[in-house]
Amino acid sequence: MKLERVLPFARTLLQTAVKEGDYAVDATLGNGHDTCFLAEIVGDNGKVFGFDIQKEAIESSTTRLKEKELFERAVLVHDSHDTLLSVLPEDAKGKVTGAIFNLGYLPGGDKHIVTKPNSTISAIEQLLEVMAPEGIIVLVIYHGHPEGQVERDAVLKFAEELDQKQAHVLRYGFINQQNNPPFIVAIEKR
């Protein structure tokens, strides 16, 4: 298949926005794969701020970062992503160039603990305040469960209503696949 799958495309988008020395955000740590990916890009002079409400996600991400010798490039926060403005350093405004959200539940974790539309939208709004122009927020939306469908609808409504003078919004996904395949909403700050 020549078309890029959803998760590789999410990384392609992040690679176009995030450079060495930048700040990036992994708004849903999960098992730390995206955190490590971003930490490799930002290098020793940048920083990745990772958020998760689940202790096991913090632990898994810490282990993965240490195994790859990237732990010093990350700040892991055991709290909701909607607290990011209170966590980011004062010099973050204009230095955050990329952020990723994997909306849904922790792979292999408790499927009753899911991301919520209100905190997700609040975090997006906060990111748009501090992001550099042309910074990109990537939301990978898993909507194969009831809460995921509610969050999908809320995030799409929010994104569709963003002023085009503030941001460009892209939706990317395969529309003829079964079982509610994940799709991307990417928001590029203008």
Predicted regions and their residues:
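S-adenosyl-L-methionine
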Residues: 1-23, 27, 36, 40, 58-95
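Conserved SAM-binding motif I beta-strand of class I
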Residues: 47-52
